[in-house]
Amino acid sequence: MLSPKRVKFRKQQRGRMRGVATRGNTIAFGQFALQAQECGWITSRQIEASRRAMTRYVKRGGKIWIRIFPDKPVTMRAAETRMGSGKGNPEFWVAVIKPGRILFEMGGDEITPEIAKEAMRLAQYKLPVKTKFIQLDEQEKSAGAKAPAASEAITVES
């Protein structure tokens, strides 16, 4: 399971999840992706369960990229412990997810949209947040009006 090798501080405050994801909200590696629709915490166990579900479905067909990393420690107190005497010990690690964040990507020559959609659907069941399946061409259409693509170089003649 995923967890940081070492951290500067062992314990963190819980924090708030406000707004939408401004980073990690576009497809970077593959052709298909799973995008979060709401905010939440995803544990390292849930990430691993989703990864296993996808890899078992696609077998050796393509490549899967995990775009999130659980870097926030969640502490818990022992059961039946009285109040006080400090904060509990770190029990597990979570990734903080905001709406729009890309969770997983998938690509490869043998991966069709149908295979990718079914694999992502199996991964969706393992996650505690609502997600949607997106393709690279859909993303280009929505972002097409903002900036020209790299393949469409603008030439200026003088």
Swiss-Prot record:
UniProt xrefs under CDD domains: Ribosomal_L16_L10e
Source domain of life: Bacteria
Claim: Ribosomal protein is one of the keywords in the record: yes
Stored PROSITE patterns: RIBOSOMAL_L16_1, RIBOSOMAL_L16_2
GO CC annotation terms, alphabetical: ribonucleoprotein complex; ribosome
One MF annotation (Gene Ontology) recorded for this entry: structural constituent of ribosome
Gene Ontology biological process terms in this record: translation
Swiss-Prot/TrEMBL keywords: Ribonucleoprotein, Ribosomal protein, RNA-binding, rRNA-binding, tRNA-binding
Functional note: Binds 23S rRNA and is also seen to make contacts with the A and possibly P site tRNAs.
Assembly and oligomerization: Part of the 50S ribosomal subunit.
Family membership: Belongs to the universal ribosomal protein uL16 family.
Record-given protein name: Large ribosomal subunit protein uL16
Source species taxonomy: Bacteria, Bacillati, Cyanobacteriota, Cyanophyceae, Synechococcales
